[in-house]
């Protein structure tokens, strides 16, 4: 299936900008720039929303303002308004179980302990929707998990993050032309790990 709604997960306050947990926001921001898609604060959708023609089809972008743990509310509002099949919703988010620079695209799956994904699965009533996980790596032990996830990338990590964003936007663009299954086979073996 071809994605019609691309959701980046993150937290809305400026203090969360450029944190590991907001890498989903960073990906859809990069898509908006590439596709010259403007954001506007959409009250009904509880998030920043943009739409345009990408790959010859209407495609929507969403960054929920509901905070990570309630992301499903915003996504559900868009799905209901546009009468979308959950399988046409591609969710982009961070995964600390993947090393920095690695991405994994899947057509379905569990929340894997990610609270944003738990909210989406609960509000959509299914886990059968595609997701693109971007590796943020685990803490080196000097800080706890929450501090790691909500922390900013180090200067030495930023070049890898930029390459990850490029690879993620390339994978999403490919999925709009060729679907999730073909994109998985091409991009799941590629990464920008050091």
Swiss-Prot record:
The lineage of its organism: Bacteria, Bacillati, Cyanobacteriota, Cyanophyceae, Synechococcales. The record marks 11 as: Discriminates between blocked and unblocked aminoacyl-tRNA. The gene is pth. GO terms for molecular function: peptidyl-tRNA hydrolase activity; tRNA binding. InterPro entries: Pept_tRNA_hydro, Pept_tRNA_hydro_CS, Pept_tRNA_hydro_sf. Disulfide bonds: none annotated. The active site is at residue 21. This is Peptidyl-tRNA hydrolase. It comes from the Bacteria. Monomer. TRNA binds at residues 16, 67, 69, 115. GO terms for cellular component: cytoplasm. SUPFAM superfamilies: Peptidyl-tRNA hydrolase-like.
């Amino acid at each position: 299936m071809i994605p019609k709604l691309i959701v980046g997960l993150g937290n809305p306050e400026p203090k969360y900008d450029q944190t590991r947990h907001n890498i989903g926001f960073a990906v859809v921001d990069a898509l908006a720039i590439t596709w010259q898609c403007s954001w506007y604060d959409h009250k009904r959708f509880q998030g920043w929303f943009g739409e345009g023609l990408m790959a010859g089809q209407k495609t929507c972008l969403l960054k929920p303002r509901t905070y990570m743990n309630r992301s499903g509310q915003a996504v559900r509002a868009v799905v209901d308004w546009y009468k979308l099949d959950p399988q046409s919703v591609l969710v982009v988010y961070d995964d600390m179980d993947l090393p920095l620079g690695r991405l994994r695209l899947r057509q379905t799956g569990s929340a894997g302990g990610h609270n944003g994904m738990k909210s989406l699965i609960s509000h959509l009533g299914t886990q059968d929707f595609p997701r693109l996980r971007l590796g943020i790596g685990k803490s080196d032990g000097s800080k706890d998990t929450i501090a790691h996830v909500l922390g900013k990338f180090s200067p030495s990590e930023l070049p890898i993050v930029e390459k990850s964003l490029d690879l993620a936007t390339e994978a999403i663009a490919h999925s709009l032309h060729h679907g999730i299954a073909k994109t998985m086979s091409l991009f799941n073996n590629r990464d920008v790990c050091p």
